[in-house]
């Protein structure tokens, strides 16, 4: 693998880097005599926080101007007639987000934040009855998911024994699908809910959403299946409606590039809302923004839910958040959507993998040695089982920060304005995004990583 090959691949796969604001050495406060302060960074951290689309600043300023010019009247009479009055600010996003998650427009809503949305959905979909009380998920789940699952069972008077957690097996780096299927089989009479991440935040594993959902539903329609799509939305093609997923929640500040802490979203299959009459109404966390919009401002003490996922909204959404999401979704629409980007994403991450696995420092996943100097790739090596992220675990481990291999590699990368995500104690997550990363900068980033290891390895020779 060479720089020339990287440049050749960049000619084959277009970049949309010019749509985004890229941090520079200067803006990051990094002083390196080899680079001008205006030199752009290599940003491989979109799996943590995506970069800002250039149009976002104008989109937010337009709404700030509306606030200045008309105040509360902008809810129904926006000063810019080309823009949406605030009362309906989130509605234009539905046709933009629906294709990204593979849903009908009536199955999605832009609302809340990831864990708040997950909790709201659990209130509706976790319905323990008889011995069917348990939730199946992963041991290494993002902690916020664990807190949500633990608290929902406690709200119903159960304890943590009603949580079934699958762990990564010794000698493996991620959970194999067959183990999830086996766990569903073994607990099918006791399961109320199955909920996994679409993509595992730490390892980057892309779970087989369709296969797992279908199998659980075949065992019993009483088993509800939900997904945390924080690392999947905007990263890999999804088809939630056709896959028969009951519900899903996501954030929008990673691959959807909508800004820190930005508003999230939900999917609820239309079978739960399309005939949502009083006779079949299922209680949920309700609020006035989920009520019939024609009745909302009459202030009636009667909840008449919208016949769509919008009925799960509780409060009016943040206007500034929503337009930030919209500006990013418009970029996705402009470039042809996630499916169009997937071909480049697979090629880009495979290029990264090939560079890493051809290194003298590469240690195969099957190796049981923890003392050998180098790194393992925790992520599945099969492109179909991952998104754009590769998680690299450095060894041997040292508790002392000045000796820790990962800490030292990450510091070297940062000194060269290569921005990635560290997960203590020993993992760096590299995520080349097809929207704004190139093969050339991926090649350069890996060479800098090897330089860091060369410097450290002298202590082990």
From Swiss-Prot:
GO terms for cellular component: cytoplasm. Homodimer. It catalyses: L-kynurenine + H2O = anthranilate + L-alanine + H(+); 3-hydroxy-L-kynurenine + H2O = 3-hydroxyanthranilate + L-alanine + H(+). Belongs to the kynureninase family. InterPro entries: Kynureninase (IPR010111), PyrdxlP-dep_Trfase (IPR015424), PyrdxlP-dep_Trfase_major (IPR015421), PyrdxlP-dep_Trfase_small (IPR015422). Keywords: Cytoplasm, Hydrolase, Pyridine nucleotide biosynthesis, Pyridoxal phosphate. The keyword Hydrolase applies. It is found in: Cytoplasm. The modification N6-(pyridoxal phosphate)lysine is found at residue 254. It comes from the Eukaryota. Pathway: Amino-acid degradation; L-kynurenine degradation; L-alanine and anthranilate from L-kynurenine: step 1/1; Cofactor biosynthesis; NAD(+) biosynthesis; quinolinate from L-kynurenine: step 2/3. GO terms for molecular function: kynureninase activity; pyridoxal phosphate binding. Catalyzes the cleavage of L-kynurenine (L-Kyn) and L-3-hydroxykynurenine (L-3OHKyn) into anthranilic acid (AA) and 3-hydroxyanthranilic acid (3-OHAA), respectively. Pyridoxal 5'-phosphate binds at residues 114-115, 142-145, 228, 231, 253, 288, 316. Its EC number is 3.7.1.3. This is Kynureninase. Its cofactor is pyridoxal 5'-phosphate. GO terms for biological process: 'de novo' NAD biosynthetic process from L-tryptophan; anthranilate metabolic process; L-kynurenine catabolic process; L-tryptophan catabolic process to kynurenine; quinolinate biosynthetic process. Gene3D superfamilies: Aspartate Aminotransferase, domain 1, Type I PLP-dependent aspartate aminotransferase-like (Major domain).
């Amino acid at each position: 693998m060479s720089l020339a090959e990287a440049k050749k691949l960049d000619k084959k796969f277009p970049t949309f880097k010019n749509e985004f604001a890229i941090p520079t050495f200067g803006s990051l406060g990094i002083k390196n005599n080899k680079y001008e302060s205006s030199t752009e960074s290599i940003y491989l951290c979109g799996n943590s926080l995506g970069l800002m689309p250039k149009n976002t600043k104008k989109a937010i300023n337009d709404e700030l101007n509306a606030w200045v010019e008309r105040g509360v009247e902008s809810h129904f009479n926006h000063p810019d007639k080309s823009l949406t009055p605030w009362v309906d600010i989130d509605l234009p996003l539905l046709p933009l987000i629906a294709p990204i998650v593979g849903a009908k427009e009536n199955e999605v809503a832009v609302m809340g934040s990831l864990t708040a949305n997950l909790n709201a959905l659990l209130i509706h979909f976790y319905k323990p009855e008889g011995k069917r009380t348990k939730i199946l998920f992963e041991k290494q789940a993002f902690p916020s998911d664990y807190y949500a699952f633990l608290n929902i069972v406690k709200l119903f008077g159960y304890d943590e024994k009603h949580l079934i957690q699958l762990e990564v097996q010794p000698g493996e780096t991620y959970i194999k699908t067959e183990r999830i299927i086996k766990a569903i089989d073994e607990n099918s009479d006791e399961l109320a809910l199955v909920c996994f991440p679409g993509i595992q935040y730490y390892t980057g594993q892309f779970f087989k959403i369709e296969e797992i959902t279908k199998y659980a539903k075949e065992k019993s329609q009483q088993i509800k299946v939900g997904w945390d799509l924080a690392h999947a939305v905007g990263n890999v093609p999804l088809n939630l409606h056709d896959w028969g997923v009951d519900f899903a929640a996501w954030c929008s500040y990673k691959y959807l590039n909508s800004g820190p802490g930005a508003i999230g979203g939900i999917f609820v299959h239309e079978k739960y809302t399309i005939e949502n009459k009083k006779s079949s109404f299922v209680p949920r966390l309700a609020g006035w923004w989920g009520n019939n919009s024609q009745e909302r401002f009459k202030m009636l003490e009667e909840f008449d839910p919208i016949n769509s996922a919008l009925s799960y909204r509780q409060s009016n959404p943040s206007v500034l958040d929503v337009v930030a999401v919209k500006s990013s979704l418009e970029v996705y629409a402009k470039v042809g959507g996630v499916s169009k980007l997937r071909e480049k994403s697979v090629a880009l991450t495979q290029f990264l993998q090939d560079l890493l696995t051809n290194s003298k420092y590469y240690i195969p996943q099957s190796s049981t040695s923890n003392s050998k100097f180098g790194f393992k790739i925790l992520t599945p090596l099969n492109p179909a089982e991952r998104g754009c992220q590769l998680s690299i675990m450095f060894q041997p481990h040292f508790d002392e920060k000045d000796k820790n291999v990962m800490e030292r590699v990450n510091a070297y990368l940062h000194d060269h304005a290569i921005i990635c995500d560290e997960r203590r104690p020993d993992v760096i997550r590299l995520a080349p995004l097809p929207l704004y990363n190139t093969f050339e900068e991926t090649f350069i980033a890996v060479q800098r990583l090897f330089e860091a290891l060369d410097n450290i390895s002298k202590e082990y020779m």
